[in-house]
Amino acid sequence: MAEEQQNSSYSIGGNILPTPEEAATFQPQVVAEGGWDKCWEDGVTPWDQGRATPLILHLLDSSALPLGRTLVPGCGGGHDVVAMASPERFVVGLDISDKALNKANETYGSSPKAEYFSFVKEDVFTWRPNELFDLIFDYVFFCAIEPEMRPAWGKSMHELLKPDGELITLMYPMTDHEGGAPYKVALSSYEDVLVPVGFKAVSVEENPDSIPTRKGKEKLARWKKIN
């Protein structure tokens, strides 16, 4: 395993996770050449830890995640979807990439939890399901979209949540690098697009479970839909 330094790549189970600054130097070219499918086809997935996000596991262990219908936009390989799924929490993993969803289904299609989650190919900006969600979890989706699309993201989060629903954002990467994806974010990046549509931040804190290359570069924010 790579030495745990904040400014160098880090390996988890064979997955090399670069810093966001490093990822922003090569990932955009692959996306430009063939979209997100090309990233998955070529194995250029620096956002994918190959396992559930440690923070999600921590929240589950401490019973700090709401129950009910849950959405993970940009679910990728589906690790967080399956981790959160339970008889009391049905989870929908959404992605526009066939390759990502194929991988998710190959990995988790025979999971004993299979009846408690589903993977759906849809665009979160246009998809309107028959039933709204109690919880949405966004980690590396917000930072992957073009910054000018962020107001539309905020509107979609509002439209997809039930009244009094909760949005959990693991805000990353909180850096000052140029370019993307991943694009740099700040708390204000979220406030600017969530507060005007009816969200209130109920807590903002450092992520105690960051992997080494992301330590000090991400924060956990929990938002309530108040109107």
From Swiss-Prot:
Cited SUPFAM superfamilies: S-adenosyl-L-methionine-dependent methyltransferases
Keywords tagged on the record: Methyltransferase, Phosphoprotein, S-adenosyl-L-methionine, Transferase
Post-translational modification Phosphoserine, affected residues: 86
GO CC, one annotated term: cytosol
Keyword Methyltransferase belongs to the record: yes
UniProt GO MF annotations: thiol S-methyltransferase activity
Family as reported in the entry's similarity comment: Belongs to the class I-like SAM-binding methyltransferase superfamily. TPMT family.
GO terms under biological process: methylation
Enzyme category, top tier: transferase
UniProt cross-references to InterPro entries, sorted A to Z: SAM-dependent_MTases_sf, TPMT
Catalytic activity: a thiol + S-adenosyl-L-methionine = a methyl thioether + S-adenosyl-L-homocysteine + H(+)
Primary role: S-adenosyl-L-methionine-dependent methyltransferase. Involved in glucosinolate metabolism and defense against phytopathogens.
Enzyme Commission designation: 2.1.1.9
Annotated residues for binding of S-adenosyl-L-methionine: 36, 40, 47, 74, 95, 123-124, 139
Descriptive protein name: Probable thiol methyltransferase 1
Consequence of gene loss (knockout): No visible phenotype under normal growth conditions.
